[in-house]
Curated annotation (Swiss-Prot):
Residues 262-282 are annotated as: Disordered. GO terms for biological process: photosystem II assembly; photosystem II stabilization. GO terms for molecular function: oxygen evolving activity. This is Oxygen-evolving enhancer protein 1, chloroplastic. It holds the Pfam family MSP. Residues 1-85 form a transit peptide. Disulfide bonds: none annotated. Coiled coil: none annotated. One of its GO terms (cellular component) is chloroplast thylakoid membrane. Its main location: plastid. It comes from Nicotiana tabacum. Keywords: Chloroplast, Manganese, Membrane, Photosynthesis, Photosystem II, Plastid, Thylakoid, Transit peptide. It is found in: Plastid, Chloroplast thylakoid membrane.
Amino acid sequence: MAASLQAAATLMQPTKVGVAPARNNLQLRSAQSVSKAFGVEPAAARLTCSLQTELKDLAQKFTDAAKVAGFALATSALVVSGANAEGVPKRLTFDEIQSKTYMEVKGTGTANQCPTIDGGVASFAFKPGKYNAKKFCLEPTSFTVKAESVNKNAPPDFQKTKLMTRLTYTLDEIEGPFEVSSDGTVKFEEKDGIDYAAVTVQLPGGERVPFLFTIKQLVASGKPESFSGEFLVPSYRGSSFLDPKGRGGSTGYDNAVALPAGGRGDEEELQKENVKNTSSSTGKITLSVTQSKPETGEVIGVFESIQPSDTDLGAKVPKDVKIQGIWYAQLE
């Protein structure tokens, strides 16, 4: 920013325009004396003065343009600096988000956030009964992957990662039956909604790990302080996806290894590349209620999910991905 302001200040300096040297002025005065002696009008003097006036006007225009350009440059530097200093947007309530226009939300990061609750109690205060959970939202705040440590002789552990995906990883608009039993236990079944998102993270060593963040077909039960369950993790790639050699699960080549007949292409080391596996796997999630507001039907909490990563259609061994974050729902 300092460099931008310095450049702007430099642009605002008046432009220096060269003037005629003293020798030319002396010649001009001599010509004027001769003209007066013979009664001749000094046209050359008028031409020289006119030229100097035009040069001064041109220099003034350049100076004004430089000032305008410098001010614009300085202003843009301040705007960029302010934008970078904003950071994470303030978390809003559901009603506050609904009151925003598209242009007010665009580019702020609010669309990737789950709502919060204004007021309420720090516990699960809903009476026993059958409810319908709507607007169920899960927002990850941490992605860790279980992998070999960068330090020697260290066992595999969950390592911090760098997010390579844009802010499109939040699950939202999920709904399903939510039951509160008389003994205080709860049960939730996921039925519909935006229940998956493709995410890619990068390990400290540079390896990138893609996975499908999801809670498809989740059935979670337990106490409100900690209710958990398993869910379905579909294949990251579909059966119609073709690899660089044109091989796929339901289309493409069966065998892309150019070898004579004899079964060489179906050997064990090549089978996992030739035979695509699109089978699903399972993951487990634990949710905890931290605050609720019965008068509006809102409830929020935190979650921790562990699920497998992408297998490249069966060619790679999946890694365990731990996802931690917050969740929000409305019970009706």
